[in-house]
């Protein structure tokens, strides 16, 4: 489970999926779940937002709450951890801001990505930003073989003993329920 460059699954594979409902206006809501957080256990996220065109820009704004129901591993409920996510893109380029609104890092942590996609290839830079400093960044390179199978490698670009700076390799296989 690779989250913003960090391996939350301690190298173990994770199963994840989501169910999303969309409206013609661009509004959407959904639930995302994963088996893969080695520290906090099973995770599910509730989200709602809006995505669409604003002039020539692709814009998406959403709120996410992260839930870890395993009582013995933290019992973090809906609303305990909340991020606002704003994404703006034009053509193959996209910038996304994740702002912590609730939780231990509320109003003290943000994460920003800049991504460029060309055909089946992508390059992304992600930067963690903490108010007190110590902000690791990472690069992720991806290749989307087809609609279902993708590969990526992620590498932190920081000389810091607090992050694992070994490259992380990701294989992603998707089984869509609809087309």
Question: What kind of feature is each model-predicted range?
Answer:
Residues 1-179:
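Outer-membrane beta-barrel proteins
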């Amino acid at each position: 489970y690779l989250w913003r460059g960090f391996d939350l699954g301690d190298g173990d594979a994770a199963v994840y999926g989501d169910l999303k409902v969309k409206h013609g206006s661009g509004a959407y809501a959904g639930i995302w779940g994963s088996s893969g957080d080695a520290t906090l256990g099973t995770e599910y996220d509730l989200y709602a937002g809006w995505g669409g065109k604003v002039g020539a820009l692709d814009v998406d704004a959403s709120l996410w709450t992260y839930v870890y129901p395993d009582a013995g591993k933290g019992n973090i409920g809906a609303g305990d951890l909340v991020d606002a996510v704003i994404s703006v893109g034009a053509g193959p380029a996209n910038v996304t801001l994740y702002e912590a609104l609730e939780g231990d890092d509320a109003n003290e942590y943000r994460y920003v990505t800049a991504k460029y996609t060309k055909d089946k290839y992508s390059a992304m830079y992600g930067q963690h930003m903490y108010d007190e400093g110590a902000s690791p960044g990472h690069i992720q390179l991806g290749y989307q073989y087809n609609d279902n199978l993708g590969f990526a490698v992620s590498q932190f670009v920081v000389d810091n003993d607090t992050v694992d700076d070994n490259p992380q390799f990701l294989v992603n296989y998707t089984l869509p329920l609809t087309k």
